């Protein structure tokens, strides 16, 4: 029986009950993850090594880099991907435990409500991630970062630091914002698909 639960959970995660949900899984699981894993590493992989300040000393560079990046973009986006997956995973675990097939989810009022709640939670998490990303990284990466070095007891309170490949990072940052907006729109469209399909089931003649 436990193997059947795992099978149902696995199929639910890969094949949601809606067409838009299946496209979202493909887009989310393939394109977005590939973009972050491959291109994200290429753009941000050696950022800390090439981040240099004036004067160019390791202690100062590390201090200012930690000020420039309270959290690295790769870690933030990886956490975003995992967090947004949680509501859907919890729902499909519930469906697997209740032995609800994917084809039956939208036929049952209670499971439909739970599924809509999971989609709404995904929207909320994506909006929250968008806000956090804008707060942490902004929308443009400037080539110069003015670092406050007061905590190091330096004569000068500000050190000028060079941000490597700032233009590439701006492009990548814009792409991640775009991915977030696309997934939000897909989730909204999925809710409309669910509502239309439920109306279709309710309007079917009784046999």
From Swiss-Prot:
The chain crosses the membrane at residues 23-43, 75-95, 112-132, 176-196. Residues 44-74, 133-175 are extracellular. It is a multi-pass membrane protein. It comes from the Eukaryota. It is found in: Cell membrane. GO terms for biological process: cell-cell signaling. Residues 1-22, 96-111, 197-207 are cytoplasmic. Keywords: Cell membrane, Disulfide bond, Membrane, Transmembrane, Transmembrane helix, Transport. The keyword Transmembrane helix applies. One of its GO terms (molecular function) is gap junction channel activity. GO terms for cellular component: connexin complex. Disulfide bonds join 53-161, 64-147. Has significant hemichannel activity. However, has only low-efficiency gap junction activity and probably does not function as a gap junction channel in vivo. A connexon is composed of a hexamer of connexins. Belongs to the connexin family. Beta-type (group I) subfamily. This is Gap junction epsilon-1 protein. It comes from Danio rerio.
């Amino acid at each position: 029986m436990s193997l059947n639960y795992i099978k149902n959970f696995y199929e639910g995660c890969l094949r949601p009950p809606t067409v838009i949900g299946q496209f979202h899984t493909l887009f989310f699981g393939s394109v977005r993850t590939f973009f972050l894993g491959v291109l994200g590493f290429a753009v941000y992989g050696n950022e800390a090594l090439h981040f240099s300040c004036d004067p160019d000393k390791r202690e100062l560079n590390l201090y200012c880099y930690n000020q420039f990046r309270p959290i690295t973009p790769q870690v933030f986006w990886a956490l975003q991907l995992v967090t947004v997956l949680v509501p859907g995973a919890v729902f499909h675990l519930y469906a697997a435990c209740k032995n609800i097939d994917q084809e039956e989810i939208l036929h049952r009022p209670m499971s439909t409500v739970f599924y809509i709640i999971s989609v709404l939670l995904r929207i909320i998490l994506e909006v929250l991630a968008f806000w956090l990303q804008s707060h942490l990284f902004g929308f443009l990466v400037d080539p110069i970062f003015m670092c406050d070095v007061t905590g190091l007891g330096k004569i000068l309170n500000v050190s000028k630091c060079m941000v490597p490949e700032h233009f590439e990072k701006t492009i990548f940052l814009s792409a991640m914002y775009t991915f977030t907006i696309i997934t939000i729109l897909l989730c909204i469209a999925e809710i409309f698909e669910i509502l239309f399909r439920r109306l279709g089931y309710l309007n079917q003649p009784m046999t």
